[in-house]
Structures are given as structure tokens and as C-alpha cells.
A protein has these predicted regions:
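Positively charged, small/polar-rich N-terminal and surface patches that mediate targeting and assembly
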Residues: 1-97
């Protein structure tokens, strides 16, 4: 099992979700909109000085699905090269015995 975490500018949220859901129809995820933070280029605070915000998507999924998500995110990154788009993968345990 793999934990997938995507943190990205909210401007690409719809594109990310549309592609992931079309390629992995049974995907389960948690979406956190309105995420504040600071990346390499800018802050995202949702205020008058730094008006943009991020979103965060977390999913626990198979290695096969994680590879699909990696491919999708590479495509999104090429389509939107100036947006802050990051994604991470961590091996996860289903249960502790």
C-alpha cells in the first residue's frame, strides 16, 4: 500500500481530480481545500498580500495506482509549468499486527 500526497495550487485542482478519477475510477481519497503554505516560489495564504491557496489530496492506494498517479501528475506539471505542483509517495502499512 502506498500513501500518495499531492499539494498543489488550487487553480489545477479540477484538472488533477478529473484525470485521476478518469484513470482510476474506484480511487478513494481525502481532499483538503484552502491549504496555506510556502513553497519555493511564493506563499499561499489566501489573504490580500498572498491571495492564492493550495489544495491537498491524500490517498492510500495500490502501487499500480500510485504509478498511474505519478504519470498523471507529470502530465499536469508539463501542462502547468508555472504552478506550484508537488506529489509524494510513502510506503504504508495496512495494519500493525
Amino acid at each position: 500500500m502506498i500513501r500518495v500526497e499531492i499539494i498543489s495550487n488550487q487553480s489545477v485542482q479540477e484538472d488533477v481530480l478529473e484525470l485521476i478519477e478518469s484513470q482510476i475510477p474506484d480511487i478513494e481519497y481525502t481532499l483538503t481545500p484552502g491549504v496555506q503554505g510556502k513553497g519555493l516560489k511564493t506563499k499561499k495564504s489566501g489573504d490580500t498580500i498572498w491571495p492564492e491557496l493550495n489544495f491537498r489530496l491524500v490517498s492510500y492506494t495500490s502501487e499500480e495506482n500510485a504509478k498511474k498517479i505519478d504519470t498523471i501528475m507529470k502530465l499536469i506539471k508539463t501542462q502547468f509549468p508555472d504552478e506550484g505542483i508537488s506529489w509524494y509517495f510513502v510506503k504504508a502499512l495496512d495494519r500493525l499486527e
